[in-house]
Amino acid sequence: MAKEHYERTKPHVNIGTIGHVDHGKTTLTAAITKVLASKGLAKEQDFASIDAAPEERERGITINTAHVEYETEKRHYAHIDAPGHADYVKNMITGAAQMDGAILVVAATDGPMPQTREHILLARQVGVDYIVVFLNKTDLVDDDELVDLVEMEVRELLSEYDFPGDDIPVIRGSALKALEGDPEQEKVIMHLMDVVDEYIPTPVRDTEKPFLMPVEDVFSITGRGTVASGRIDRGTVKVGDEVEIVGLHEDVLKSTVTGLEMFRKTLDLGEAGDNVGALLRGVNREQVVRGQVLAKPGSIQTHKKFKGEVYILSKEEGGRHTPFFSNYRPQFYFHTTDITGVIELPDGVEMVMPGDNVTFTVELIQPAAIEKGTKFTVREGGHTVGAGVVSEIDD
C-alpha cells in the first residue's frame, strides 16, 4: 500500500514546557501525547523516552532536548522538553528550539521556585511572549485556598516580568493522574490544549516578515555588476525590489535587485531559507562586504550598543577556563562576521564564570545590523565561548 502523504493542512506552532525541576514538565509532555494519541492526533511517548533526550549541537554548544510532535483539531505542534535546567537556558538563548509560546508548569505543592522565576525571565528576554500556566499536582493539596494562593503568586511573578499576569490562563490538574488514565484528568489535558490553541497565536511565517539576507560572499560579474550571496533569513525578494545594504558603516547604501540566481539558475522569487545570489544595480564590488545584510528598506538599522542575554560555555564545553570581568573584549559574531565589542557587567555582578548565564551590555567598535531577537555567538580567537540573543537596543 502507498505511504500516506504528509499534508500540511493545519497551522504549525512551536511550544515547550518550562518551569522548575521536578514540577512535572516531562510528565505533562508525556500526558499530552497519551491523551491526544487516544484521539488519533499523536504518537504516545512515555516519560522515559522523553526524559532520555538526545544530545544536539547548536552553534558549538551541546544541548539535550526532546522533540515531540502532536496535533489538536486546529493545529500541528512541535513541543520541546529539556531534561536539565542548563539545557533550558542554552535552548532558549541559542534559539535551538524557537518557541512561539510556552506552558509554564508549577507544582501546587511547592509554588514558584527559583527556576520558575528564571524561566519566566528567560522567556521575556528571548521573546517568548505567550505563556499558559499549568498548576500541577493539585491532587496532592487538600486545601483549595492553598492552590488559590499559589495561583496568585504565579500571576504576580508573571506580572513582575511584564507578562499579563492577571489575564494569563491558569489550568489546574495532575499530569501524573492523566498519564495513569484518570478520565477527569484526561479532560483537563484536553482543556489545556484548547486553551493553548486559543491563547497562543499562530506565528507570522518567516516568509511574511520583511526581507533580510546576511551577506556571505561578494563577487563581480564582468559587464553585469556586483552579486551578493547568502541565505535568506526571512521574507522574500524578487527582481526589481529595492533593498538597503546595512551594517559595518554608519551610512546605508540603497540599490535595486536586477537579477536573482539559485544553484546557477535564474530565479523569480527568493524566500526565507533559500541560498541566493542577488545582482545589485549601481554597486561596486568594494561597497558590499561579508557581515552586512541586504534588507527591505527601513526594516533594520545599525547599532553599536545593546543588552544581551548570554550563556557562557563551561570549560567542559570547550569554553573559557577562567572568569571574565567588565571591559572584557571578545568578538561578537553577528550574521556572518566577527565584530569586537566591550562588555559591561550589570551592577552587583563582579565577574562571570564559565557555565553562567548573564545579561550584560555590549558596545561594538563597528555598527552592526541588529534588532531585539538577533542571535550572536561570543568568540575568542575563533573559538566559541558563549551564545546570546539581543534583548534590548541601547543606543
Swiss-Prot record:
GO MF term list: GTP binding; GTPase activity; translation elongation factor activity
Region G2, residue ranges: 60-64
PROSITE patterns: G_TR_1, G_TR_2
Residue span(s) of domain tr-type G: 10-204
Cell cycle as UniProt keyword: no
Catalytic activity, reaction form: GTP + H2O = GDP + phosphate + H(+)
Enzyme class, UniProt record, top EC level: hydrolase
Sorted UniProt keywords: Cytoplasm, Elongation factor, GTP-binding, Hydrolase, Magnesium, Metal-binding, Nucleotide-binding, Protein biosynthesis
Superkingdom: Bacteria
Family: Belongs to the TRAFAC class translation factor GTPase superfamily. Classic translation factor GTPase family. EF-Tu/EF-1A subfamily.
Protein name: Elongation factor Tu
Protein's organism: Lactiplantibacillus plantarum (strain ATCC BAA-793 / NCIMB 8826 / WCFS1)
